[in-house]
Amino acid sequence: MVQISQIGAVLAVCSTLTVAAPTKGKARFNVPQVAVPMKAVHHPAVAYARALHKFGMKVPKAVSDAARGSVPTTPTKDDEQYVTQVTVGQGKLNLDLDTGSGDLWVFSTETPKDQSQGHNLYMPTSKSKRLDGYSWEITYGDMSSAGGDVFLDTVSIGNVTASSQAVESAKKVSDQFAKDKATDGLMGLSFSVLNTVQPKPQTTFFDTVLKQLEKPLFTCTLKHGQPGSYDFGYIDDSKHSGEIAYTNVDNSQGWWGFTAESYSIGGGSNSTHSFHGAQHHGARGSSIDGIADTGTTLMLLSDDVVQEYYKQVQGAKNDQQQGGWVFPCDAKLPDFTLSISGYNAVVPGKFMNYQAVGSVCFGGLQSVGSSGGVPNIFGDVFLKSQFVVWDTEGPRIGFAPQA
């Protein structure tokens, strides 16, 4: 994961990447998510800390303390995690698809047995090509980490195969990853400039197979409380209602960045507000820049917007012990609407109830912080409310209500 301070270096190596040109192919495929029972449920501050660190933001001490001090709990029968099955080499792995990163890293037979137990493993064979002298390492805000070496191997999703895809094999993972048995790694779907392999970044799976696809795009239909799906190379119009509203993407830092002009909380004629405030939140006049990221669970916005939202939630407070905004679990939560190129994207209030922590519930909307130059993050809490098109032509991103 790339920090803000590293962006200059990342952009410098961008020109060394060889990305498949978006010439028209014929392939299209659907990838349904699958539900995997969770073996442990972490404190939501863990997800919050990872998101902040992922984008180079300072992790407040209260958030860090809550994340480090938490103990995984036994899940209920309804606790599930949604992953995507990907064939890596000779085996199938359950991976998280992450539009906020450019790495494809996996548990493997190189991962120590005490760290890989319970995971599906990538097994390099004689057909796998090790990239001598290449390595990768990632550290998250809750101090979870992973690292290892790099192979070129076949990676397949649906009917599309990348015959020489960089696969980052984990030779070490922290306890946080080892204990998360639901996932066997991560597949990054950002622009390839964010790939962290050294000494030379590698292309993402999407960029590798781009010329095979009918259209140079993918879509996601993530769901609240149930598995969603990804479609590559085409737009399934049965999955959305109404027209798709497109807006330009700023990929200068490797992310799927876009601009929202305004927001509203709840309903009524007096509920609409423009994004405003200090430039340290990326505001340009009445607009605000954000990043669409399937790899971030929460939605992270500026302090003033977050505070205004929770003023309308009875009993809500920024709890230092829990590391974020919490509220009574039976509290009525207002809808949150973003205006994007004239389209109103509505996040239902129920999506803002992320997870119970003791006698209260942790909010799906949290503060992005106040460090200079930090981006706003539109994570799964937002994305699960929309049908989203990620189009490399432009590039642009599109939104529509889910059917």
UniProtKB/Swiss-Prot annotation:
Cleaved propeptide residues: 21-67
Residues at the active site: D98, D293
Family matches, as Pfam families: Asp (PF00026)
Disulfide pairings: C329-C361
Reactions catalysed: Hydrolysis of proteins with broad specificity. Generally favors hydrophobic residues in P1 and P1', but also accepts Lys in P1, which leads to activation of trypsinogen. Does not clot milk
All copies of domain Peptidase A1, residue ranges: 82-400
EC number, UniProt record: 3.4.23.18
Glycosylation sites: N159, N270
Enzyme class: hydrolase
Subcellular location per the Swiss-Prot or TrEMBL entry: Secreted
Primary location group: secreted
Role played: Secreted aspartic endopeptidase that allows assimilation of proteinaceous substrates. Can catalyze hydrolysis of the major structural proteins of basement membrane, elastin, collagen, and laminin. Thought to play a significant role in virulence.
Entry protein name: Aspartic endopeptidase PEP1
Annotated source species: Trichophyton verrucosum (strain HKI 0517)
